[in-house]
Structure formats: C-alpha cells, structure tokens
C-alpha cells in the first residue's frame, strides 16, 4: 500500500484545529498539511489574529476541490465548538505532559485540538478531551503549532497504514 493512497483505502476520519490561534499564517500552513493527510476539516476556536490577509490570500490559492475536501471552520469559543461537535467523535488534546505520541493509539474518528504556543490548550478544553497526548522531545519548549499538527497527522497515518 502506497503512502499517497491512504485516504482512498479507508483512512479513518479526523479533523484538526487550533485553540486561540495567534497567526493566520499558522492556520494556513496547518490547513495545507491537513489536506495532504486527508483531514475532514480544519478549525480555529476563538482566534486571536487580527490580520487575516495571509489567510485570505492562501484561500485564493486553494482550488475549489481542496476547499471542499478540507473546509475551514471558525468557532467563537470552546462552548460554541463543543455544542457543534458531532457524536461519535473523540476529542484529543495535544499538550505537554500527556501520553507520549509514540505510545498512543489514535481513535478511528478523532478531533485533534492544538494550543497556541504561548497558552496551550485551555483547562476547559483539556477537561473535555478523552485523551491528552504529547510529542516527545529533547527540550522542554513547545513545538510550533503547525509542526506539532504535522507530526501528529503523520503519526496517525503511519499507524493506520500498517
């Protein structure tokens, strides 16, 4: 089975997003990566960026098909997000101090929530998560949110491919 055929061979569904994202740039990059890994959608909960120009410009670059494959959703706050979450999906927080990603078995239908590098995932959001996972690293500083998302999606695809 070839890596680029993951989605067409029944890769379980997932969505990924950022809690209180600081920059539109990170959202844009995460969306491009999420589309490549077959995400159902990408979202931002209570975004903090005021300059949406990078996001708007990137949207123009995405084809209509790409926009349909991985739509972007913006939520006012965590309660808005939680109220609209479909049943049967498992919320997974990506935060330092959680279960190491190397030991984690991804749920078949997962929603991954990343925190911005300065504040992380809120206590309210963490409490709602069934799992909290972390990316093992040599240093204690957090990963860039886009990099963290890419690592988790790659790990997910490897574990479902094998």
Spell out what each predicted region is:
Residues 25-26, 120, 143:
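Residues that form or flank phosphate/diphosphate-binding pockets in enzymes
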Residues 27-28, 107, 145-146:
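Conserved strand-to-helix beginnings and helix N-cap segments that scaffold or border functional pockets
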Residues 53-58, 104-105, 146:
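Short secondary-structure transition/capping segments
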Residues 78-83, 99-101, 140-142:
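A short acidic, often aromatic-flanked loop/helix-cap motif at beta-alpha or helix-coil junctions
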Residues 125-162:
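Structured adenosyl-cofactor binding patch, chiefly the S-adenosyl-L-methionine
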């Amino acid at each position: 089975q070839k890596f680029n055929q993951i989605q067409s061979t029944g890769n379980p569904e997932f969505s990924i997003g950022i809690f209180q994202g600081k920059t539109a740039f990170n959202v844009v990059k995460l969306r491009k990566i999420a589309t490549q890994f077959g995400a159902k959608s990408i979202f931002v909960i209570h975004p903090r960026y005021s300059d949406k120009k990078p996001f708007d410009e990137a949207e123009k670059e995405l084809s209509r098909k790409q926009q349909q494959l991985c739509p972007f959703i913006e939520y006012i706050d965590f309660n808005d997000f939680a109220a609209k979450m479909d049943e049967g999906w498992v919320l997974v927080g990506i935060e330092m101090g959680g279960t190491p990603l190397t030991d984690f078995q991804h749920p078949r239908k997962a929603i991954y929530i990343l925190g911005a590098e300065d504040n992380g995932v809120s206590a309210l959001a963490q409490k709602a998560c069934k799992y909290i996972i972390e990316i093992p690293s040599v240093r204690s500083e957090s990963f860039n949110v886009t990099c963290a998302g890419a690592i988790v999606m790659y790990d997910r695809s490897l574990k479902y491919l094998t």
